[in-house]
């Protein structure tokens, strides 16, 4: 989910950063028994713990035949040992609707793409502010951190791989959104109907389904005119999955007319460049410059005209915090000037947008979604409808982005007046669709990457992209 750059935003170093989610080390230390150190009896002892010398005094050794018989019995006992239970307990259905907890018996989910850092992290002297941030990261760390992320990523992969098979000209955008969101809720085993259930796991933000010159932040809304996918459309699919607030944000673009292939190739290559350059202590301005260089080395031929692919200037990649899709760091797709660096423990959504238009996105009419500003004061609220709506939002979404569809799914009615009051007071912020000039085409690819101490894990990587 792209982070729009404010009009008055100056790209530069941040004075301070918020705490970031922590990450586990790659190979945690094993217990002695698990590592095989306590596999058998100590030297000089029998398996019963008795000293061998006590048994040998004044006694003859057992015959060779007796020893052989004993060995055979032991071998038989070894063969009868029960096999370990496999990790997978069953297969996924089509469409995917079986909760992952029913497939992965031990609740451990697969690793994604592990990439070693190209240079050793030899910067051992840290400034005080960075040490403080690192302590905040450690305090936020728990044993389930990495497993939560891997579960969310596995849900994303399974859902999107099915959705890609049904995404064809003639399908309605509302049907695609429902398939994605129903799949996510089924696989996380959290339907989000009971109060607070959506905060445990589920959708991290509304499904983005943006066509052609619509760059980002469009989703079907109740009562709106149905939009049908056409053969000549360029469709961007952007959705997020969270488990306990650990958000995986990933997006891809589909086109059926091969004339758009070079556009998609350019944006995918630019995103992979950003992932390659990302790492601990990586300078964000260097990453941005590399992304733009790759993106704008491509051209696309449309209507017998050669059009350069341009990197969109006013939307960026971003770091991700717990229960917050947009953190305090941005990764532009164009050359910029900043001293900001990536840090150990950061989680980034590395995404790029390429356009055949002016490569600048403006707000369009309509509303994509909302999010609640946790720091805004509700002291000035007087309407009971606004107060009731705010409680519903906090109880069910917290700081996660939500849409009108999500409110109506909870059975909330007549919320428009209350929502206008919350938005006018600055308690709730709204997202508008972002568009390039009519007649242009925008493509997007995105992955979430975890900057672990000794490697980076592209957590959302799959066989598809």
UniProtKB/Swiss-Prot annotation:
Residues 71-86 have a biased composition (Basic residues). This is Methionine aminopeptidase 2-2. GO terms for biological process: proteolysis. Its cofactor is Co(2+); Zn(2+); Mn(2+); Fe(2+). Its main location: cytoplasm. Its EC number is 3.4.11.18. One of its GO terms (molecular function) is metal ion binding. Residues 1-92 are annotated as: Disordered. It catalyses: Release of N-terminal amino acids, preferentially methionine, from peptides and arylamides. PANTHER family: METHIONINE AMINOPEPTIDASE 2, METHIONINE AMINOPEPTIDASE 2-2. A divalent metal cation 1 binds at residues 238, 249, 446. The lineage of its organism: Eukaryota, Fungi, Dikarya, Ascomycota, Pezizomycotina. One of its GO terms (cellular component) is cytoplasm. Belongs to the peptidase M24A family. Methionine aminopeptidase eukaryotic type 2 subfamily. The keyword Metal-binding applies.
